[in-house]
From Swiss-Prot:
Main location: periplasm
Record gene name: hip
Database matches in InterPro entries: High_potential_FeS_prot (IPR000170), HIPIP_sf (IPR036369), TAT_signal (IPR006311)
Function: Specific class of high-redox-potential 4Fe-4S ferredoxins. Functions in anaerobic electron transport in most purple and in some other photosynthetic bacteria and in at least one genus (Paracoccus) of halophilic, denitrifying bacteria.
PROSITE patterns, per database record: HIPIP, TAT
Protein name in the entry: High-potential iron-sulfur protein
GO-annotated biological processes: aerobic electron transport chain
Signal peptide coordinates: 1-37
Length: 122
């Protein structure tokens, strides 16, 4: 134990407050170890008219693939990454987000699905 008496001075209180305030941004940067995938600004939104018409979902496992399956692959294997309409060289494309001929100027998730899915040739 310390022989130093507990000091409740204003200076000590300010030090504690500043230390706490400095730690908050660091906690947000660390994110408590959780991965957060964020969609790019030009990603197809869920309320996009074309997305609604084509039943597009960024997560193919949550889409209506079984009911609206297209020929070429079993429904559980159909996703944007193996679709003919996906454009890997679109502006702003990443490993997870690519362009699509059906959504000009916007990006789709490679793990997504829509009712126009068509097996990529070759």
């Amino acid at each position: 134990m310390s022989d130093k008496p507990i000091s409740k001075s204003r200076r000590d209180a300010v030090k504690v407050m500043l230390g706490t305030a400095a730690a908050i941004p660091m906690i947000n940067l660390v994110g408590f170890g959780t991965a957060r995938a964020s969609a790019p600004a030009n990603a197809v939104a869920a309320d996009d008219a074309t997305a609604i018409a084509l039943k597009y979902n960024q997560d193919a496992t949550k889409s209506e693939r079984v009911a609206a399956a297209r020929p070429g692959l079993p429904p559980e294997e159909q996703h944007c990454a193996n679709c003919q309409f996906m454009q890997a060289d679109a502006a702003g494309a990443t490993d997870e987000w690519k362009g699509c001929q059906l959504f000009p100027g916007k990006l789709i998730n490679v793990n997504g699905w829509c009712a126009s899915w068509t097996l990529k040739a070759g």
